[in-house]
Amino acid sequence: MGHSRRPAGGEKKSRFGRSKAAADVGDGRQAGGKPQVRKAVFESTKKKEIGVSDLTLLSKISNEAINDNLKLRFQHDEIYTYIGHVLVSVNPFRDLGIYTDSVLNSYRGKNRLEVPPHVFAVAESAYYNMKSYKDNQCVIISGESGAGKTEAAKRIMQYIASVSGGSDSSIQQTKDMVLATNPLLESFGNAKTLRNNNSSRFGKYLELEFNAQGEPVGANITNYLLEKSRVVGQITNERNFHIFYQFAKGAPQKYRDSFGVQQPQSYLYTSRSKCFDVPGVDDVAEFQDTLNAMSVIGMSEAEQDNVFRMLAAILWMGNIQFAEDDSGNAAITDQSVVDFVAYLLEVDAGQVNQALTIRMMETSRGGRRGSVYEVPLNTTQALAVRDALAKAIYFNLFDWIVGRVNQSLTAKGAVANSIGILDIYGFEIFEKNSFEQLCINYVNEKLQQIFIQLTLKAEQDEYEREQITWTPIKYFDNKVVCSLIEDKRPPGVFAALNDACATAHADSGAADNTFVGRLNFLGQNPNFENRQGQFIIKHYAGDVSYAVQGMTDKNKDQLLKDLLNLVQSSSNHFVHTLFPEQVNQDDKRRPPTASDKIKASANDLVATLMKAQPSYIRTIKPNDNKAPKEFNESNVLHQIKYLGLQENVRIRRAGFAYRQTFDKFVERFYLLSPKTSYAGDYTWTGDVETGARQILKDTRIPAEEYQMGITKVFIKTPETLFALEAMRDRYWHNMAIRIQRAWRNYLRYRTECAIRIQRFWRRMNGGLELLKLRDQGHTILGGRKERRRMSILGSRRFLGDYVGISNKGGPGEMIRSGAAISTSDDVLFSCRGEVLVSKFGRSSKPSPRIFVLTNRHVYIVSQNFVNNQLVISSERTIPIGAIKTVSASSYRDDWFSLVVGGQEPDPLCNCVFKTEFFTHLHNALRGQLNLKIGPEIEYNKKPGKLATVKVVKDGSQVDSYKSGTIHTGPGEPPNSVSKPTPRGKQVAARPVTKGKLLRPGGPGGGPSKLASRPVPERRPIPQPTPQTAAAQPTPASRPVPQPVAAVAASHSRTSSTASARAPPPPPPAPPAAAGPKKAKALYDFSSDNNGMLSISAGQIVEIVSKEGNGWWLCMNLETSAQGWTPEAYLEEQVAPTPKPAPPPPPPVAPRASPAPVNGSAAVAAAKAKAAPPPPAKRPNMAGRKTAPAPPPAPRDSAVSMNSQGDSSGASGRGTPSSVSNASLAGGLAEALRARQSAMQGKQDDDDDW
């Protein structure tokens, strides 16, 4: 989210395709032409909000306006605000609940315009840009102490660890260790100050290392400017580093026994400031977190023991006190403390005494070593030596911990890119400022210089270099302040300080006075003022006054050789690890001072940051009381000024949000123009500049939204860039949709094919079981009973459960429930019928019932109305094993009895599906059914009283029962079996392409395989010959010869009767007797089905009967075999029509007729005898195409298929034009080709390929 100092600017780092609403630029349409759907998402800065979320949207740009906006948002718990890509954060001093997992997930994959300002948005941008553009990233967090820099750094680490993915155990271990560095380094490097309860007293640059997949594989930490002076002294109400209080309060018993750990009140270094606790912080729990972090990092128990041994040594070292002896020299007051410190450091106690009270001095003469003298120290000097040793041990211990963390975080794979997080304490202005504040403020000046170079100066320089029209903005360049501090020529503050230390190194007071004299040479610098005992530097954050006293001693930053000799004499290897350098007694070179080290570290930091793409977080401290809801306007206004927020806003408003070289721009966005790309390939043949212009033109970006530079294209607003990225994402989205559509089409095609195969299989074989059951019924009857015609139809199936007792819901379920039919019973058969019911005093009468046969019982169910409500109950339940005999007659009637022989009379039943009932009962009894068929039906009318019912065959069409006799009609012979199953009506196969499953031609889009398959030609259907508009169509009939009227010269009636009329013509001969109809096979037809007749092309068969469903029953003339044959495969042979008798001669002309003139009589006679001429051809109308040539050897269909018939075609034989269209198959082919063309055009219109 930062500005770029390079051609590949930071603004290019916006994610592509993240902002759906950002595409509403230009004409407000996506590349695909659809209106923007997620337009509301883009309204985050336009909807009603608290103030403005981006300071560049302020109507008035001033420090006061920025202050008012930040205050308004702060009072409504909106602590984050943008300045373009820079995030401004105000410390709320309380938990707002904005760092939960749900909030974190809401920022995944989003650009800053889609979501409210947040530190997670900065982290998302940095991670996305690193992963997408393969550029190193860094986040620079700046602000004064207590503004929230450390918290922001932790939240960035939290976000990156959450979204960086990677399920591998090593990657997860790396994430855990990175997160564990926070509590560990905070405990050793943070402390409570007056302004901040968790102030970082060191600078930290954490560099997270990632592989090519964006997964963390390692990390590296560089620390800067540890405030080691805090170890030995703090001002009132401040504390030492957290670890001392955690260790003193929460140390386990083994450390208390081994290291003599006591409460913090017992140690001078932790009790001098009279502050032992931090509100809201549990030091014991924090110590446990520190131990856990050490374990996660991988510190062994021995390493942890050594770390805490050094902490105990430092605490006990602070309790060493000195008093003046008789000579005025320092003497140790309590030797036991010295002995315990020696035990902890594992050195000799005498050496400790000597190192703390005596200084070894060596004289030299002519470059040679001279005498060595022991110089006693006074109490002040002894205390300084003691504190120097404590500070050196802690400083080196902290460096060792950082190095140990880096050792554990060493990358475990190839490192592709990194994200750096800089957390360093900010600008400090105290009542008394010394060398520490000078170093801190110097580093902040360097960071401010980076910000100016990368965001302000580089922006203007690039516009000038690219000849871009814009409004220049004046800004303060703090390079002069950095030069004032660090330059050697002319000498700066650090150079003067080093010179004073070198010339007057023995006496601190003299060195300070020498330093003051050197500062006089800087008086001409406008950013410097030298005053009595102090000097003032005009920093970007304000004027700071530094006290000179003690600066030279702090700058020396070297441990006395006596103390180095002391620690190197330790028998503890860990102590040697902390102090690895050997004392070189002959080295005369000046060791590097503290200012040299901080200068080198700052320059290294700047070089590191310049190699990465920066993002910025500017933190602001709202008040000095660490109080929530309190906003000190004057303090915040001061921070706004020294952070340069106003200049940043003005630069942002006047500049361009995105810039990129022409080649990179074209490489990224060439897909958006049809003139620069085709099917994903780059096709532009011109130069990259014209290609970039073409892309912007085709994407309809307004001209005021961009400018073309010398080598780059500049886009003014980020919304325009997000629109381009959204279009690019839409391109890939469309490609994915097309692939998905093709795949889904294929799946639907495959599914449709499978369904058709299944449907065909079920149609061919699904009813076989039912047919077998039907044929079994014939076997059970055994030719003993006449059959009804409907019973032996070819379409008859034994379906079984006709009432639907087994169905869920509906009347069948109601009947099952009312009859109490167990759910464990399998229903084999059910139907409605009648039962003969005898009533007292009345003759028996059939009554409706429902018969239900299960695998265990036969239920006779009755339905009665009781109190106007239908009551369903089982009238009789008969176990199937109790049925001894089933009695039926040998006639076609539907009556039968179930002979049970119990205490109840046997039921006499009437059921139209009796044969099916017998069959299912036979199978339920496993073939043990005793079916008795005879001339009478026997049943027990009363228990033990056998009765018979006579069956009389008469002319009754319907069975009837009366007075013990059943009347029925004649039936089919008893040996009758079911007819062959009739074939269904043949219909044209529905193509798989119907419903736009696929393009015509099959799944590959090529020629359809169906097209190459021979299609049988259907016989043309005779149609009436079309007539002209003047003549109404009449049914075609055989012409009857009529006498020709005599030709007369006049229509007047003659008065002569002398002429005799000719006798009437003889009647026509009677038609010949019709013979059997025959048909010729046009194609081969083969079938294994017994009900179908196989034929070969050219074979003549006899037509037995025709069905209206497209099948004819035919007989083979050679074998007399009969079967069904498809009508479309046959051509009926029409017997030749005999020649009609010649017309009778015309009657003799009357004698009274006048003589014809000029031989007209001969002409008339010739016309009468000559055959009539053929009908004239239809004239070829202008603009009408000539009819195509007729196909070879067309079969005469005796009807003209011409759509505009000629009335003269009464002979039944069409004209050449009609003959060409006589083939129905040809006409259908033409129609199908026309329909296919129409469908193809429609599909091409629908398809966006």
From Swiss-Prot:
Residues modified to Phosphoserine: S371
Major localisation: cytoplasm
Domain Myosin motor: 50-729
Claim: NAD is one of the keywords in the record: no
Gene Ontology cellular component annotations, sorted alphabetically: actin cortical patch; actin cytoskeleton; cell cortex of cell tip; cell septum; cell tip; cytoplasm; hyphal tip; mating projection tip
Record domain TH1: where: 787-979
Positions of region (Disordered): 1-40, 959-1081, 1127-1249
Alphabetical keyword list: Actin-binding, ATP-binding, Cytoplasm, Cytoskeleton, Hydrolase, Motor protein, Myosin, Nucleotide-binding, Phosphoprotein, Repeat, SH3 domain
Protein modification: Phosphorylation of the TEDS site (Ser-371) is required for the polarization of the actin cytoskeleton. Phosphorylation probably activates the myosin-I ATPase activity.
Function: Type-I myosin implicated in the organization of the actin cytoskeleton. Required for proper actin cytoskeleton polarization. At the cell cortex, assembles in patch-like structures together with proteins from the actin-polymerizing machinery and promotes actin assembly. Functions as actin nucleation-promoting factor (NPF) for the Arp2/3 complex. Plays an important role in polarized growth, spore germination, hyphal morphogenesis, and septal wall formation.
Assembly: Interacts (via IQ domains) with camA.
Name the UniProt record assigns to this protein: Myosin-1
